[in-house]
Regions:
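Conserved structured core elements
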Residues: 20, 127, 176-177
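Short, solvent-exposed loop/turn segments at secondary-structure boundaries
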Residues: 194-196
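Conserved N-terminal/central alpha/beta ligand/cofactor-binding core
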Residues: 2, 32-33, 39-168, 173, ...
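Hydrophobic/aromatic ligand-binding patch that stacks against planar heteroaromatic rings
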Residues: 21, 25-26, 46-47, 182
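Short, well-ordered coil/turn residues at beta-beta hairpins
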Residues: 14, 179, 185-186
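N-terminal Rossmann-like FAD-binding beta1-loop-alpha1 element of flavoenzymes
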Residues: 9-36
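Core beta-strand elements of the Rossmann-like FAD/NAD(P) dinucleotide-binding domain
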Residues: 5-8, 171-181
Length: 196
């Protein structure tokens, strides 16, 4: 097994939707060097790998961000940070608009308004949501991608995470990655509690 040492400003562990979106946001707002490590391939990884038929987090006309917070709090039986949910909820529609600009097909009615489904959902043709995000990430100026690299542990010095260790699944390589910051985007925590 060969050893490869890498250095980056920001390491993102996980190349699903959240990891890709984080990389895009960082790339568009800074010149920081970003490295995504994904155990599969960012084109079809994460919980949206196969696509979806709706965006289930959108503030539809007549609703406000607090409504989404209330829904999520009830759904999680109160185990939430309301302040974080509110901050996220205030940006949901902005993220949706951005995904549409990247090429995601969002269904619209005859007046050009998004077709909604319920109180917080939009109908989409989302089978290509991950390939669309992957393409945008691949074109980002300061983002490098390591597909098929499984991160196995954090690199820690003096109680501070300063990188990670990974194994190339297909290339027999052990990666030692130094990073000034690490974002863990390895998946949601859904299903940790009893459904209500």
């Amino acid at each position: 097994m060969k050893i490869e040492k890498l250095s980056t400003d920001i390491l993102i562990i996980g190349g699903g939707t959240a990891g890709c979106y984080a990389a895009l946001t960082i790339s568009e707002n800074s010149d920081k060097k970003v490295l995504i490590c994904e155990k599969a391939h960012i084109k079809r990884s994460g919980c949206l790998a196969a696509g979806v038929n709706a965006l289930n987090a959108y503030i539809v006309d007549g609703r406000k961000p607090q409504d989404y917070v209330d829904y999520a709090k009830k759904d999680a039986d109160g185990i939430v940070r309301e302040d974080l949910l509110l901050t996220m909820s205030e940006k949901l529609n902005e993220v949706t608009d951005r995904l549409e600009k990247l090429g995601l097909v969002i269904l619209k009615d005859e007046n050009g308004k998004y077709v909604t489904r319920g109180n917080r959902n939009l109908k989409i043709n989302g089978e290509n949501i991950k390939p669309i995000l992957a393409s945008a990430v691949e074109q980002a100026k300061n983002v490098e991608i390591l597909n098929r690299v499984n991160i196995i542990d954090f690199a820690v010095k003096e109680n501070k995470i300063n990188g990670a260790y990974g194994i190339g699944i297909e290339n027999d390589t052990f990666y030692i990655i130094k990073a000034k910051a690490v974002i863990v985007a390895t998946g949601g925590a859904a299903g940790l509690y009893k459904p209500n």
